[in-house]
Amino acid sequence: RLRAEKKLARTIHFSFGYAEGGGIHKQYTLEDPTNLERDIFKVINYFANRLCDKKALYRTLSVSLTQFIKESNRQLNLFIDEYERKKDVKLAKTIDHLHLKYGKGIVSKATSYTEAGTKHGRLGLMAGHKM
C-alpha cells in the first residue's frame, strides 16, 4: 500500500506475542526511508534473531509503519547502491501492477512452490479461514 500511495516509511514498529502472554515490542527508525518489503523484513528478522526466544511459542506478530514521507522527497543516500535500489523499486512496482491486474496469486517467490511454501494453500483465506 505504501507504493500505491507513493510514500516511504521511516519507522518500523513490531511486536511478537508469546502464546503464554507477554512478548517483545520494538521500534526502529531507518536512516533511509523505504517502501520495500525486503528492507522492512530485514530489520524485523535482525531483531527477531537477537531478541526472541527460539524455544517459545508465538501467537501474534504485529508490524506497523510510521513517519511517512513522499517518494519525491527522498534524499539521495551516498552509502547505498542507488542503481540496485531503483532496480528493486521498479521490480516491486511491476509486481504490484501484476497483482492489481491479475490477482495476488499471479507472481510468487520460488520458495512458495517448495514443499515448505504455504502461500498457494492460503490464497483465498482470511486469518486462516475460508471467506
Language-model-detected regions and their locations in the chain:
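Basic, low-complexity intrinsically disordered segments
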Residues: 1-131
